[in-house]
Structures are given as structure tokens and as C-alpha cells.
């Protein structure tokens, strides 16, 4: 067989095409690797879409209780429980879960800081918040009396308005200069639930902290706030490690088996946080694809 000088043989053409095919495949594989981690999400538009979803909640909260009713159903619904509401929100942002069920005011606080999230208009459930106290304690009657007075004189409304709405931050509750002959009142809370309780530097602040201070001002106690996991609060009250639990806690039949509750001091509702479909799409997948193509292009130069 005679080969013309400078003209590639069929074998050379074959191997060149084979290398080109592998190069193209490399482009796609590298692009996939760089874009990795982006997966299809279940679209949640209301309660009817929760079946089969990956739901995030804060451990031990009312949201946890209601979400548990979906757990283990035929649709394959799963519940991820987090010690902090912020951790559940972060899991939603990184596509580890499809939605978060949480109280409305903390939800509004989280969404305000994360415009890529939104709260569905459909309410999951409506509830009342109250203070948990050791069973059969005379403190229950004292706290109810103080709450009634604080409601009547507008103090409770002022505290709430200082954290929500257009007047937020303009009317803080100021600790009163009164005698405190009754010692220390220990309040157990979970400072991961803004605006009810959260940390501002070393201090624990929020709606519940202010309400507790107002109650102590009325009853002659010095207030001490102890931060702990939410699901440890009732045990702390039962065992006397804390006098009261104030942590955006709703009254439920299960909790009433272990502690007493004061009269409610506010109403709340559980809502569903999801990804905001109108938020600008993340550039991460595109950047990943470009990076993959760039690496593949460098590889092609070496062929």
C-alpha cells in the first residue's frame, strides 16, 4: 500500500476522531462535576403539597408537632429536625429540604434577611403562646394577675409593637426602678427564635424577654434568663432548674401533662417558608458550567 506524503492514513483519522469524542465527553462530565449539588426541588404552594416533601422544623416546637403528622406516610414525607430555626432555613437555601414550618414572626425575620425565600399565604395553623410553670405552683396565679394588668395598661401591646410593624424599635420596654423583695425569677428560653428571643451581643433580648422583665417589675423579682435547647425547657421547669419557660411556646395537650400554663399573652400562627420563585436565579450553575468548559478546553490543548 502506498501512502501519499502529508495525507493522513485512515488509521490516523480514526484515532484522531476517537480522541475528539473523548474530549467532548470530558467537557460534559467536567461541567456536571462543577455544577454538582444542584438538584430538582419539589414545588410547595400550599399544605396540599406537603405530602412527599422534605420538611424542616426546629426540634420540639409546634411546627415539629404538626409536621410529624406527615412523617412516614405513603408519599414518603421526611422531617429534618434542627436545634435552631436558622439551621432549618439554611438547609432550605442549600436545597437539603423543600420547606420550613415555623412560627410567623420568626419566619418574617428570616425572610427579611433572605430575599430568595418567601412565606406562603396559606396559614398552617393558628395558636396561642403562654408561659409554662411547674404544676400546682402559686406562681401561676401571680403571673396571670401581672399579665392581666400589663394587658389592661397597654404594656403588652407596646412590647409587641416595638418588634414588629412600622414602629419597630421606637418604643423599647425600660426596666422599672422598683424594689425586688421576692428574689430571682429564672426564665428558661431558647434564644434562637427572633423576634421572641435572640442574642444581641451577650444579652438575650426580644418580645419574651421584655414580657418577662415587665412581669418581674410587677411582682418584685429580679429576672435571670437561661438559654437552652427548646425541648429542654419543660424539663427545666419540671425539675425546678427554672421557674418559668417563656419561648414562644404554644399550649398543647401533651405539654399540659407535664406543666401548667399561664393565660395566653399573644396569638401566633405556623407558616410555611419556601424558595421564592421570583428571586433572581443563582449564577452558581452557570459559573460551574463555564468552569467545567474552561478545564475541558485546557485538556483539549494537550491532545
Task: Set out the residue ranges of the language-model regions.
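Bacterial N-terminal signal peptides
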Residues: 26-33
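Pocket-lining segment of extracytoplasmic ligand-binding domains
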Residues: 41-116, 136-138, 250, 271, ...
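Extended ligand-binding regions for polar small-molecule ligands
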Residues: 59-62, 127-169, 210-218, 274-282
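Ligand-binding clefts/hinges and TM-proximal coupling segments of bilobed small-molecule sensing domains
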Residues: 62-77, 115-123, 145-182
Amino acid at each position: 500500500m502506498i501512502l501519499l506524503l502529508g495525507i493522513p492514513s485512515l488509521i490516523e483519522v480514526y484515532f484522531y476522531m476517537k480522541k475528539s469524542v473523548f474530549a467532548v465527553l470530558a467537557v460534559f462530565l467536567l461541567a456536571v462535576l462543577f455544577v454538582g449539588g444542584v438538584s430538582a426541588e419539589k414545588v410547595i404552594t400550599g399544605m396540599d403539597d406537603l405530602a412527599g416533601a422534605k420538611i424542616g422544623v426546629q426540634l420540639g416546637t409546634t411546627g415539629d408537632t404538626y409536621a410529624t403528622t406527615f412523617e412516614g406516610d405513603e408519599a414518603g414525607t421526611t422531617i429534618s429536625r434542627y436545634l435552631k430555626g436558622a439551621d432549618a432555613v439554611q438547609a432550605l437555601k442549600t436545597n437539603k429540604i423543600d420547606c420550613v414550618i415555623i412560627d410567623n414572626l420568626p419566619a418574617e425575620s428570616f425572610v427579611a434577611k433572605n430575599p430568595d425565600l418567601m412565606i406562603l399565604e396559606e396559614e398552617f395553623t393558628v395558636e396561642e403562646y403562654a408561659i409554662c410553670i411547674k404544676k400546682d405552683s402559686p406562681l401561676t396565679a401571680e403571673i396571670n394577675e401581672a399579665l392581666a394588668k400589663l394587658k389592661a395598661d397597654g404594656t403588652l401591646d407596646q412590647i409587641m409593637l416595638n418588634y414588629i410593624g412600622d414602629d419597630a424599635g421606637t418604643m423599647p420596654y425600660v426596666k422599672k426602678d422598683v424594689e425586688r423583695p421576692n428574689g430571682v425569677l429564672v426564665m428558661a428560653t431558647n434564644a434562637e427564635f427572633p423576634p421572641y428571643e435572640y442574642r444581641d451581643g451577650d444579652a438575650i433580648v426580644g418580645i419574651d424577654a421584655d414580657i418577662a422583665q415587665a412581669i418581674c417589675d410587677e411582682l418584685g423579682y429580679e429576672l435571670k434568663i437561661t438559654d437552652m435547647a427548646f425541648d429542654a425547657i419543660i424539663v427545666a421547669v419540671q425539675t425546678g432548674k427554672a421557674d418559668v419557660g417563656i419561648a414562644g411556646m404554644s399550649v398543647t395537650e401533651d405539654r399540659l401533662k407535664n406543666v401548667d400554663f399561664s393565660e395566653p399573652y399573644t396569638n401566633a400562627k405556623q407558616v410555611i417558608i419556601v424558595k421564592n420563585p421570583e428571586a433572581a436565579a443563582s449564577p452558581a450553575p452557570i459559573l460551574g458550567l463555564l468552569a467545567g468548559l474552561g478545564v475541558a478546553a485546557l485538556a483539549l490543548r494537550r491532545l
